[in-house]
UniProtKB/Swiss-Prot annotation:
Protein name, as recorded: Methionine--tRNA ligase
Major place of residence: cytoplasm
Biased segments, Acidic residues type: 570-584
Organism whose genome encodes this protein: Natronomonas pharaonis (strain ATCC 35678 / DSM 2160 / CIP 103997 / JCM 8858 / NBRC 14720 / NCIMB 2260 / Gabara)
GO biological process: methionyl-tRNA aminoacylation
Function: Is required not only for elongation of protein synthesis but also for the initiation of all mRNA translation through initiator tRNA(fMet) aminoacylation.
Record region (Disordered): 567-590
All copies of domain tRNA-binding, residue ranges: 600-698
Gene name of the encoded protein: metG
Keywords (A to Z) from UniProt: Aminoacyl-tRNA synthetase, ATP-binding, Cytoplasm, Ligase, Metal-binding, Nucleotide-binding, Protein biosynthesis, RNA-binding, tRNA-binding, Zinc
């Protein structure tokens, strides 16, 4: 059990590495804004902390996109890495160090990790079946191949079931493989590869999950994966782009590079080391975070907090702790996994240009803190959050302008005009208690890993401030009871200072402006939480309004620009289709050349079923549990439709299911059959007429 923050041991906060293969949009930024806010909050508690990340320069997505543009992968990735370095600060995301996986530090650190695994016999070579494109005469690692997930039947990429059960897929597991290079069905060929023996860490991982702190989804999802027998992790790929496997004279390893999910998380360590070297180990010692061993054995956990998207929980709670343990490094203290960001109720679509790009927001002239507040407070951290210009306007005008800004401006303006600044009076017990309660809530939010609570803290205190000033009406007291008027305004100025301190993690730019308005010395970014109760300066100038109301015409223009861009992209798609004599259907897999016999088809027991009940599976992102009537009995089926259908409305729907499929267990829930659905949106197969449950599909 970890002690609460702050701790004497330094901490590190990391964010999942962005792939250096495309422009950033506001959906991507949720992880990094949240990580920045959490690191700032730790600092305000007096915690020594480094906030680090870096660009993921390797892997098949970058190799694929670089080849399409006719450039080498390194040049392609460096261009986006440099773009990210410029973009993050424009959203007040201030990394202590932002590196990349292809630099010298990470290359050597990664090889050091792998050599440790080799020396301790955690690496084994196996002959495995890998996807191969016969026409291109090359292997198809990871995203060079697509097909069907063997676990849930959804469309999947070569290394991940990204649209279904979220499982990591090993080379050779994907079914009905298709090359993304030529579009042809792939074949399988035998190749030697290196594996990390995850089975060596099975018992350790079970204990690790029990110790792990963070969000519930990161604590619960891994239990399914580690309760069964862990499969060894293939750590090499047949590619030219990446960090070479350190073969150490083993000829079979010389033409292999390391899997991207080996060197990517190791960048967390490398980036921390780079920061330590910049400031000096006397100020921040990276090994005190990652390698503070006792008698050569790492402790159960360092003060390491990973902030990621919920689609990479398995990598950070199963693979990564095993990798750390095998190399003698500390395990993470916490993993915080956030939901996705939707755009006005629907998913972002970069292919359709249906996105608000980071540059769009910057060019809009809107303050970055408005986005930070909207995305952090818009939902609980583990849930999906919606971004829209209309939603941003509503939350800004209601909460930041109407509540926070209104209290600050009316109270500080009254204080400056009537007293030249802070009135000469003591803070009342009522207000001191309210500020102390807000500080306690802030500390709790940090230690409970509730980023949303950090955003709510200053607004809730401002809500109290508005009620307090309205209740006492100091404008009436200046003549009738001047001493009481001074007391009320003194309290309000103290609340304003407390708001500046509490708001700094989520609204760093606006908090700095408020700090300056109060005439404070130094920077609010260096202030610790206790400063919320320290006396403000005696004098300050007339304040400016901290927040500007977002007018309808401004938001309408931003919406118009987005709609025009989407329409232009759609029109371009249609024009491209018209130019083809036989336009191919988008995103459809070719019909398999291999045919099955009619007898094989008859072996499938396909029936009409009626949905009796549908409910989400707790802790699973996409899975739902359905009770269905198949005529002869009621069955339970698990399907990846949680995010795609209104489960409450499915009761009574007639669907089509495969009834004689072997039973499977998904996320700890038994599934006895499979429903049939079409496309990425899982359109359910239904019947035109009212076929009774149990009717066989011929």
């Amino acid at each position: 059990m970890h002690e609460e923050f702050p701790t004497e041991t330094p901490a590190v906060v990391t964010c999942g590495l962005p792939y250096a293969n495309g422009d950033l949009h506001v959906g991507h930024l949720r992880t990094y804004v949240s990580g920045d806010a959490y690191a700032r909050a730790l600092e305000s508690l007096g915690q020594s902390v480094a906030f680090v990340s870096g660009s993921d320069m390797h892997g098949t997505p970058i190799a694929v996109n670089a080849a399409e543009e006719g450039v080498d992968p390194e040049s392609f990735a460096v261009e986006y890495h440099e773009q990210y370095e410029e973009t993050f600060p424009q959203f007040n995301i201030e990394f202590d160090n932002y590196g990349h996986t292809h630099d010298e530090t990470n290359t050597e650190m990664t090889r050091s990790f792998v050599r440790s695994w080799i020396d301790d016999d955690h690496v084994v070579e196996k002959e495995i079946e890998v996807a191969w494109d016969a026409e291109a005469d090359q292997p198809l690692p990871d995203r060079f191949v697509e097909g069907t997930c063997p676990y849930c039947g959804e469309k999947a990429r070569g290394d991940e079931c990204d649209e279904g059960c979220q499982r990591h897929l090993e080379p050779g597991e994907i079914e009905a493989p298709v090359s993304t290079i030529t579009g042809n069905p792939a074949e399988y060929r035998t190749r030697p590869h290196k594996f990390l023996r995850l089975s060596d860490f099975q018992e350790y991982l079970r204990g690790f999950i029990d110790r792990l702190e963070g969000t519930e989804n990161a604590q619960n999802q891994p239990r399914e994966w580690i309760e069964g027998e862990l499969q060894d992790l293939c750590i090499t790929r047949d590619m030219d782009w990446g960090i070479d496997y350190p073969a150490d004279g083993d000829e079979s390893g010389e033409d292999l590079v390391l899997y991207v999910w080996v060197d990517a998380p190791i960048e967390y360590v490398s980036s921390t080391k780079q920061y330590s070297e910049q400031v000096g180990r006397d100020e921040y010692d990276w090994e005190a975070v990652w390698k503070n061993q006792v008698d050569g054995v790492p402790p159960e956990g360092g003060e390491i907090v990973h902030i990621i998207g919920h689609d990479i929980i398995q990598h950070h709670t199963v693979f990564w702790p095993a990798m750390l343990r095998g190399a003698g490094f500390n395990e993470p203290r916490a993993v915080m996994a956030c939901g996705f960001v939707n755009l006005d109720g629907d998913a972002f679509s970069t292919s359709r240009n249906r996105a608000v790009w980071a540059d769009d927001y910057i060019e809009s002239g809107l303050h970055p803190d408005l986005y930070r507040y909207h995305i952090i407070t818009g939902s609980e951290f583990t849930a999906d959050v919606d971004f829209s210009w209309d939603g941003l306007q509503e939350r800004t005008n209601s909460e930041l302008v109407g509540t926070l800004g209104n209290f600050l401006y009316r109270s500080l303006l009254f204080a400056e005009r009537n007293y030249g600044g802070t009135p000469d009076a003591a803070v009342s017990d009522e207000v001191r208690n309210e500020i102390e309660a807000a500080m306690a809530d802030f500390r709790t939010a940090v230690n409970d890993y509730r980023v949303r609570g950090l955003g709510r803290a200053p607004v809730e205190l401002a809500t109290f401030g508005n009620e307090y000033i309205q209740r006492h009406e100091p404008w009436k007291l200046t003549d009738d009871d001047p001493e009481k008027a001074r007391q009320v305004i003194r309290d309000c100025v103290q609340i304003a200072k407390a708001i500046a301190v509490l708001a700094e993690p989520v609204l760093p730019g606006k908090a700095a402006a408020l700090w300056d308005q109060l005439g404070e010395d130094g920077s609010v970014h260096d202030a610790e939480l206790g400063a919320a109760l320290e006396s403000p300066p005696e004098a300050f100038d007339e304040p400016d309004e901290l927040f500007e109301k977002l007018e309808d015409d401004r938001i309408e223009e931003l919406n118009r620009q987005l709609e025009e861009r989407i329409e232009a992209a759609d029109a371009g798609d249609e024009e491209g289709e018209d130019e083809d004599e036989e336009p191919p259907a988008a995103d459809l897999e070719p019909v398999a050349d291999e045919r099955i016999s009619f007898g094989d088809f008859q072996d499938l027991d396909i029936r009409v079923a009626e949905v009796l009940e549908a409910e989400p599976i707790e802790g699973a992102d996409d899975l739902a549990k359905l009770a269905v009537d198949i005529g002869v009995e009621t069955r339970q089926i698990v399907a990846g439709i949680k995010q795609l259908h209104d489960l409450d409305s499915l009761s009574g729907t007639r669907i089509v299911v495969v009834a004689n499929l072997e039973k499977a267990e998904l996320f700890g829930v038994e599934s006895n059959g499979m429903l049939l659905a079409a496309g990425e949106q899982a359109d359910l197969l239904t019947t035109l007429e009212d076929a009774e449950p149990g009717t066989k599909v011929q």
